[in-house]
């Protein structure tokens, strides 16, 4: 007969093993930014150029927007899955750690850029114009060529204010013009605190695209919208590109302006960095000679908006104006501060502890690619970022 003590010991071991196996798996810990790969090569794709990046350091995935396609890859650059079939312009991306999803800007319009995308996609005729925040359920992206419309991986929320500004005709100081504030749509997208605060709830923040018309004065501000997305599930719906819905909030929770001088197509990439408590705006070079035409600007999160009239904009009253950060190079003629930094307009992502991933776009055999490099913020006037090697 088996010794009773041995039986008791075996039973205790079985209970311990069952209890251990029944425990939920521990969540993966985010990788310290300094230990992340110094370089991630996205590979090349037969699409438009890379528009933005988003990083999930906990689950160790990186996401790229290639104009009409979303790419999910691991941190070595190996592609896990793609979402295709878009005939609009998929711009910047941001990862929301609160719900584990990737948010992006999506534009449908019949201007030169929109027509080019439609032609490249084989779409005949025009399309209903509209602007959407698209939300990707990235856990479901498990293979390449998943359909944005049919595979249940993407929902969309309509942003009515941007469409209204895009389609508006206004009376400027130079006469009647289309596109209020020069609005060409929107590109930059990120989560951060309400302007004027460094903590609290995170608001989805969108930045306008702005046409680079040098003959008007109402397009010299960056325009930023903030939304509280905690109740956005009621608006989310799949997007049929043949019959696009109009589900979305009536207005943003805040509209803000930053005077930078005109930049071609506004803010290309927008990100908020918790370590420095700043918003960063990466832009294309502007064409107006009276401005310094920096390619990187910053706004301190603690800077409170001030109700002010907008210079060169006669058709609105006093608006919420945010000052630029007092870091960077100051242009003595205008007081505008910023940096001449050559990268960031195709991807700028804060990942913690003053580290950033920044896209270096390239073309190879007529295909578009990006080498995404790890940088550390220095704050210096001449070299705001240093590459980590």
Language model region names:
Residues 38-68, 187, 193-194:
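Beta-strand-rich domains and repeat architectures in extracellular enzymes and scaffolds
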Residues 76-126:
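Blade-loop segments of beta-propeller domains
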Residues 68, 107-110, 139, 168, ...:
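Residue-level signature of beta-propeller blades and closely related beta-rich strand-turn architectures
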Residues 47-54, 87-96, 165, 182-192, ...:
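Repeated scaffold domains used in trafficking and secretory/extracellular systems
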Residues 117-143, 217-236, 240, 292-314, ...:
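Beta-propeller blade signature
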Residues 37-42, 139-186, 229-264, 308-342:
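Surface-exposed loop and turn segments in beta-propeller and other repeat-based domains
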Residues 55-58, 95-99, 193-200, 274-276, ...:
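Residue-level detector of Asp-centered blade-edge/turn motifs that repeat once per structural unit
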Residues 56-86, 249, 304-311:
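Beta-propeller domains
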């Amino acid at each position: 007969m088996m010794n009773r003590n041995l039986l008791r010991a075996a039973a205790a071991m079985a209970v311990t093993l069952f209890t251990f196996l029944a425990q939920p798996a521990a969540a993966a810990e985010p990788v310290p930014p300094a230990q992340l790969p110094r370089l991630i090569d996205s590979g090349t794709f037969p699409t438009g150029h890379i528009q933005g990046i988003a990083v999930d350091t906990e689950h160790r995935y990186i996401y790229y927007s290639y104009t009409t396609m979303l790419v999910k890859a691991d941190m070595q650059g190996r592609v896990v899955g793609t979402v295709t079939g878009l005939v609009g312009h998929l711009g910047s991306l941001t990862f929301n750690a609160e719900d584990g999803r990737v948010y992006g800007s999506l534009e449908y319009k019949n201007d030169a850029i929109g027509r080019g995308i439609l032609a490249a996609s084989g779409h005949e005729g025009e399309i209903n114009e509209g602007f959407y925040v698209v939300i990707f359920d990235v856990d479901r992206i498990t293979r390449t060529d998943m359909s944005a419309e049919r595979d249940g991986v993407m929902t969309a929320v309509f942003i009515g204010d941007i469409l209204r500004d895009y389609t508006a005709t206004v009376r400027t100081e130079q006469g009647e013009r289309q596109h209020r504030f020069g609005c060409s749509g929107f590109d930059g997208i990120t989560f951060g605190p309400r302007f004027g605060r460094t903590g609290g709830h995170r608001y989805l923040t969108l930045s306008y695209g702005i046409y680079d018309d040098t003959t008007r004065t109402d397009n010299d501000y960056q325009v930023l919208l903030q939304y509280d997305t905690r109740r956005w599930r009621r608006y989310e719906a799949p997007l049929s590109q043949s019959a696009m819905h109009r589900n979305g909030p009536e207005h943003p929770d805040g509209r803000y302006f930053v005077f930078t001088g005109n930049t071609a197509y506004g803010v290309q990439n927008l990100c908020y960095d918790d370590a420095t408590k700043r918003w960063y705006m990466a832009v294309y070079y502007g064409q107006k000679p009276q401005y310094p035409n920096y390619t990187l600007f910053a706004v301190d999160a603690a800077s409170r908006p001030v109700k002010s009239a907008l210079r060169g904009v006669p058709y609105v009253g006093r608006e919420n104006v945010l000052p630029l950060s007092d870091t960077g190079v100051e242009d003595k003629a205008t007081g505008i501060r910023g940096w001449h930094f050559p990268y960031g307009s195709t991807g700028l992502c804060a990942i913690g502890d003053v580290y950033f991933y920044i896209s270096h776009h390239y073309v190879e055999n007529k295909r578009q690619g990006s080498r995404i490099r790890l940088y550390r913020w220095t704050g210096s006037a001449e070299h705001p970022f240093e590459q980590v090697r």
